[in-house]
């Protein structure tokens, strides 16, 4: 189904996924105008990754959930990704100081098999990553972990789960863009699982080395001096 529409376009050095929140600081005059314009309408614009060789072909629509204007005209906003689009045509003319784009909305292809097993495995691996990361950062273990609670909120939707975990991984933006462009949910889950397994191995190794160094190379409790 063709669902072409025209939206304000905001090229950025990030990859926005549906179902995820992104804070932005609006300071350029043209984007101040964009924010003013969309606040009068549906509060929606498109974010597309600005690559070294131009704009990516796929981006995400976002809804401005919170907008906090500052006294000097700048604003801090919080955007929520809603759906993906393919760029059909970028429009740069005198009608607005910012670019607009004709876009086509799209979703993942229908999945005929249950992806519950893949989703559970990915969620469990993500929990290990967060735990190891917290250890490395010296945060106390136990208690609620916001990222895992957020992952549980989208656990029943493999597509949203894949987007949520992808957005939380410290990987190259070109890889995130690849995942954003995929339309096969199962394939995206598998690719993210492979990447996540590598990251978990690295983090758990660093966390283990960190624990050993705190005990001066001995097992047991850290020495007190």
Q: What positions do the PLM features span?
A:
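N-terminal low-complexity, acidic/polar interaction/targeting segments
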Residues: 1-225
């Amino acid at each position: 189904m063709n669902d072409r529409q025209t939206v304000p376009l905001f090229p950025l050095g990030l990859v926005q996924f549906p179902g995820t929140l992104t804070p932005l600081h609006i300071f350029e005059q043209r984007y101040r105008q964009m924010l003013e314009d969309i606040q009068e309408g549906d509060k929606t614009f498109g974010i597309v990754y600005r690559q070294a060789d131009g704009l990516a072909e796929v981006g995400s629509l976002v809804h401005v959930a919170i907008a906090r204007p500052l006294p000097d005209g700048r604003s801090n906003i919080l955007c929520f990704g809603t759906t993906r689009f393919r760029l059909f045509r970028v429009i740069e003319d005198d009608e607005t100081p910012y670019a607009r784009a004709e876009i086509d909305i799209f979703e993942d292809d229908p999945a005929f098999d249950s992806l519950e097993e893949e989703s559970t495995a990915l969620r469990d691996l993500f929990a290990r990553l967060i735990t190891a990361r917290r250890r490395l950062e010296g945060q106390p273990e136990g208690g609620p972990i916001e990222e895992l609670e957020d992952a549980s909120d989208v656990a029943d939707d493999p597509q949203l789960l894949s987007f949520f975990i992808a957005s939380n991984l410290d990987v190259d933006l070109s890889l995130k863009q690849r995942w954003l462009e995929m339309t096969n949910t199962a394939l995206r889950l598998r690719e993210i699982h492979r990447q996540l397994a590598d990251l978990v191995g690295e983090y758990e190794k660093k966390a283990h080395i960190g624990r050993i160094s705190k005990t001066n190379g001995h097992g047991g409790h850290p020495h007190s001096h």
